[in-house]
């Protein structure tokens, strides 16, 4: 949704607001929903709603979210009951958790080849340049899983074994309490992270003391063709398809499960 459409949605009557939000996929919105909450959803539809801490409650493994203000207000003893996973972003109708750091390779570096060169992955859609659906890709988890399964134990024609980038994301763990299944983000999720990079970086700096995005290329799980996949340059925000022998960074994401802070 554009900024202009967002502004128009704020000005129309409540019945039309509810109808428009329902059409965008927010089926939980009804005429009984408070206007203040509807305004939050309108912001979510058209831009950045919020960024929150995603934490695991150590006692039962449940996933809990805190705003920055809520986290600061907790006592030291209360904070010790939770283990931080990453940051949860809600923007442009989407919600997912972003790891608090990039993956590292076996040498301690931060870049990975994609792997699978020459393979047109089955059940993974190709998005050629100019494809109108490129920025509505919702299959990051499924595509990561398929890429790993189809490259397992195989060495491509460029001497890369497996799918290093996808495997790094899939095997990522934030800490000993982390039971989430992380994956290589879709091009849509990665572009969203790039769009709100400054806000995410500020949040990471404040609540994780680091882990900000580098101004380098990051791999997505979205395929271009049998020899290339999509990545995003965090330095200038461009999306491009690159050969799978290229090196790129990996920032895992995972699906969010809504839970209220206690």
Residue spans for each PLM region:
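Short, compositionally biased
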Residues: 47-178, 244, 251-262
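Helix N-cap / beta->alpha transition motif
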Residues: 10-13, 139-141, 186
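C-terminal, surface-exposed recognition/capping segments
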Residues: 162, 172, 180, 187-262
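Surface-exposed patches in mature extracellular/periplasmic domains of secreted proteins
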Residues: 29-31, 177-185
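Extracellular/lumenal glycan-associated surfaces
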Residues: 15-25, 94-101, 181, 187, ...
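Surface-exposed receptor/substrate recognition regions of extracellular proteins
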Residues: 1-52
């Amino acid at each position: 949704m554009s900024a202009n459409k967002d502004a128009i949605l704020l000005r129309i009557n409540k019945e039309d607001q509810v109808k428009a939000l329902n059409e965008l996929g927010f089926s939980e919105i009804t005429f009984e929903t408070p206007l203040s909450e509807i305004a939050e959803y309108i912001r979510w539809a058209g831009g950045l709603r919020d960024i929150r801490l995603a934490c695991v409650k150590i006692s039962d493994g449940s996933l809990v979210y805190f705003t920055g203000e809520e986290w600061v207000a907790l006592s030291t003893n209360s904070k010790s009951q939770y283990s931080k996973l990453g940051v949860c972003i809600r923007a442009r109708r989407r919600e997912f958790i972003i790891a608090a750091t990039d993956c590292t390779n076996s040498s301690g570096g931060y870049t990975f080849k994609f792997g699978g060169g020459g393979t047109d992955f089955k059940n993974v859609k190709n998005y050629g340049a100019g494809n109108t659906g490129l920025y509505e890709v919702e299959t990051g988890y499924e595509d990561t899983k398929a890429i790993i399964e189809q490259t397992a134990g195989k060495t491509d024609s460029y001497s890369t074994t497996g799918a290093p980038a996808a495997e790094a994301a899939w095997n990522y763990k934030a800490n000993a309490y982390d039971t989430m299944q992380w994956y290589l983000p879709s091009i849509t999720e990665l572009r969203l992270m790039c769009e709100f990079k400054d806000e995410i970086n500020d949040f990471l700096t404040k609540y994780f003391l680091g882990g900000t995005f580098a101004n380098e290329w990051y791999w997505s799980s979205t395929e271009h063709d049998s020899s290339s996949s999509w990545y995003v340059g965090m330095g200038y925000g461009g999306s491009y398809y690159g050969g799978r022998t290229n090196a790129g960074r990996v920032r895992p994401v995972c699906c969010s499960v809504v839970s209220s802070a206690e």
